[in-house]
Amino acid sequence: MAGKENNFPPLPPFLPLKPCFYQDFSDEIPVEHQVLVKRIYRLWMFYCATLGVNLVACLAWWIAGGAGANFGLALLWLVLFTPCSYVCWFRPAYKAFRADSSFNFMTFFFIFGAQFVLTVIQAIGFSGWGACGWLAAVGFFGTSVGAAVVMLVPAILFSLSALVMAVTIVKVHRIYRGAGGSLQKAQTEWSAGTWRNPPSREAQFNSFSGNSLPEYPTVPSYSSSGGHWP
């Protein structure tokens, strides 16, 4: 069977770049997990949008008298975390549910957990982090009310992102443990090298059952030289 053509990210045909990944929820993700995986994908999009809003808020912060370094860091976070969050925690989640891969589940938990901690820090809004969180927004009301109101928007969005991330970790962990996942299975996948490109569940089933039955039933043949009916 020919390999599936990559379709993500969708790029205009005039660009010399081509999509890097194949992504189709209905084709690769089991029906019972499609809703959850789609929600994780929407969470990634929501977080990227939050980084974009944060960039605008940091610009308002800078114009109103804040440090320009915050705007520079906000731009860096947007450019860096948009692709990296997709590759580092959404794709492991996608592959984990696609192939029931313990290694990819472990990768998701580790990196997504770090992402959750970072998002909480961004929601708090420590000075010099390039994030318009609560501390930065509330503390700037004495300088510029208009800019502070704009800065409250990413603070709210970062808080919502962190909340949804916490709920997502709990849900995915329950499914993983309920299916019998463990660190030992992840180590086995690492040793066998199947973590690189784990086959889908359908491919695993076909590999298991493909030779168990012939494609067509075997029909017994009888010699024509035997006796005849009277």
Swiss-Prot record:
Entries under InterPro entries matching the protein: SCAMP
Phosphothreonine PTM sites in chain numbering: 194
Keywords, sorted A to Z: Membrane, Phosphoprotein, Protein transport, Transmembrane, Transmembrane helix, Transport
GO terms for cellular component: membrane
Any one of the GO BP annotations: protein transport
Listed transmembrane segments: 40-60, 61-81, 106-126, 149-169
Cellular localisation: Membrane
Cytoplasmic face of the membrane: 1-39, 170-230
UniProt keyword annotation of Flavoprotein present: no
Membrane topology according to the record: Multi-pass membrane protein
Domain of life assignment: Eukaryota
Summary of the function given for this chain in its UniProt record: Probably involved in membrane protein trafficking.
UniProt family annotation: Belongs to the SCAMP family.
Name of the protein in its database record: Secretory carrier-associated membrane protein 4
Organism from which the protein derives: Mus musculus
